[in-house]
Amino acid sequence: MFNNILKQVGDYAKESLQAAKYIGQGLAVTFDHMSRRPITVQYPYEKLIPSERFRGRIHFEFDKCIACEVCVRVCPINLPVVDWEFNKAVKKKELKHYSIDFGVCIFCGNCVEYCPTNCLSMTEEYELAAYDRHDLNYDNVALGRLPYKVTEDPMVTPLRELGYLPKGVIEPHNLPKGSQRAGQHPEDLVKAE
């Protein structure tokens, strides 16, 4: 009987040490994760900067499109809608309308990759939420708008903004007043016509 009690005490001690070991391993993992940087952000107020190859909303350039419909053929769900007419005078297709429904799009990037004229490109824009699903059907006008930038942080300047500065100027804040930037804004194009 005395041996039975000693055996039970010994087993209890072994199980206690084993439980302490497992608790120690769990705490080690917890402390390891506590020393890492946080992964989550407070989304509406903080936004992550997308990676260089991020596949966001598709940007479409109407003037470059030759209405070849390669984007429709490579799309796994035949999503882009391309309306064109054949111009007999110049013997070419003329694009009339182009649209993509982002409520259905899976953002695979095949249309961008296989486009022969590079009229399609992926942007960093990922905020496409809408109250009505029909608002997600972007036509050629909505697809042609480039988003300004994802973050409002002035320290983060996308390279595409540097492309609109005059030659030799890297910092947009050093521009003299009234200096003309390279490229035209949409409102300048409307005034010119």
Curated annotation (Swiss-Prot):
Write down the species: Synechocystis sp. (strain ATCC 27184 / PCC 6803 / Kazusa)
Membrane topology value:
Peripheral membrane protein
Assembly, in brief, is: NDH-1 is composed of at least 11 different subunits.
Gene Ontology molecular function: 4 iron, 4 sulfur cluster binding; iron ion binding; NADH dehydrogenase (ubiquinone) activity; quinone binding
Protein name in the entry: NAD(P)H-quinone oxidoreductase subunit I
Q: What are its E.C. numbers?
A: 7.1.1.-
Q: Provide GO CC annotations from the record.
A: plasma membrane-derived thylakoid membrane
Gene for this chain: ndhI
State the free-text cofactor note. Binds 2 [4Fe-4S] clusters per subunit.
Q: Which residues bind [4Fe-4S] cluster 1?
A: 65, 68, 71, 115
Q: Which regions form coiled coils?
A: none
Query: Which protein family is it in?
Result: Belongs to the complex I 23 kDa subunit family.
**Compartment(s) of residence:** Cellular thylakoid membrane
Q: Which GO terms describe its biological process?
A: photosynthesis, light reaction
